[in-house]
Amino acid sequence: MKNSELSHIQPSPLSTERIFDCYLFINPIGKQCYHCEQEVMKFIERTPYKVHVHFIPFHNFKSVTQYMKNNHLNDKNIDLRNEIYTKIYDASLSYKTALLQGKKLGRAFLMELQTQLHLLHKEYTPELLQEIIQIIGLDEKMFYEDKASKLVHQEYEKDQQIAQEMMVEMNPSLVIFDNLNQQYGVILHQNITAEMIEHVCDNLHHDLDKCPKKTHRHQSCCVIQMVH
């Protein structure tokens, strides 16, 4: 189905009948990702639509470079790059591990981690991780057992596969689908604000005709097609 063939689909007049799935691909220790999460939650609080939100940890060579440049770090320093990569990977595994004790605790873990890093300006360390576990009330023994398990690593790899299927190349990236057309979605790489998300959701089918398809990197807004 071509994008032009979707123009006859009209949004339901009842906003409550529309359900949106928002996939925000994040670096758990990235400040820019933290701000985008706040914008997504702001949108959810004020929208009349039903929204399912998914925070998905994702990183690759390019996203690590992006993180280092955003933080004015020397991305040519191999030792520093490896250190940053390890921290992002460990934080991602820790978030996936916390989710095994419930979605609510998983979200609380992510929020507390980002509060400690970006508001209290602490470094990501094993000591900070243990402190966060205690603050939000995770089962500590279970946490460390789960984190070392094959299951958590498999769940993490699934997230990387989802990112690849949705053509995500950087973070933060937000992919939006709705229940009226689950084959096509819109991906945002820039200007991820509550206002922009609201605009996309209100005009999703119109935007599917207007936005270009994902054909190359660094497109700020484009359409992706999911193959099921």
What are these regions (language model features)?
Residues P11-P13, I44, Q164:
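Short, flexible, glycine/charge-rich loop motifs used to bind or transfer phosphoryl groups or to couple energy/partner
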